Curated annotation (Swiss-Prot):
GO biological process entries: translation
GO CC, one annotated term: chloroplast
Annotated GO MF terms: rRNA binding; structural constituent of ribosome
Similarity-based family: Belongs to the universal ribosomal protein uS12 family.
Gene name of the encoded protein: rps12-A
Organism field: Platanus occidentalis
Name this protein carries in UniProt: Small ribosomal subunit protein uS12cz/uS12cy
InterPro entries: NA-bd_OB-fold, Ribosomal_uS12, Ribosomal_uS12_bac
Length: 123
């Protein structure tokens, strides 16, 4: 506990909150271009080949973004929309690609949770 004299000498500093998605620069989403599309393996208890893309954003950042859903059409030079949101078992992946916008098509034959994967209501 500081004394009054110590508090006069230097005041209490406010706690600075650090953003979890700095590349978005305070925006809800950002547009970017895929520079590389590849798969990586998750952390220890899990096992899979997770689809990710290296994306150069309009803010100038180069980030790794997760491609959600089963199957995708993304390749190099695809223009995508990126939102925040990490993938817990992929270290360094702090962004998601938004399906159903720009060059990323929605997931084929998706019936439930369609809004998260950019799928229109089936007829």
């Amino acid at each position: 506990m500081p004394t009054i004299k110590q508090l006069i000498r230097n005041t209490r500093q406010p706690v600075r909150n650090v953003t979890k998605s700095p590349a978005l620069r305070g925006c809800p989403q950002r547009r970017g271009t895929c520079t590389r599309v590849y798969t990586i393996t998750p952390k220890k208890p899990n096992s899979a080949l997770r689809k990710v893309a290296r994306v150069r954003l309009t803010s100038g950042f180069e980030i790794t973004a997760y491609i959600p859903g089963i199957g995708h059409n993304l390749q190099e030079h695809s223009v995508v929309l990126v939102r925040g949101g990490r993938v817990k078992d992929l270290p360094g992946v702090r962004y998601h690609i938004v399906r159903g916008t720009l060059d990323a098509v929605g997931v084929k034959d998706r019936q439930q949770g369609r809004s998260k994967y950019g799928v229109k209501k089936p007829k």
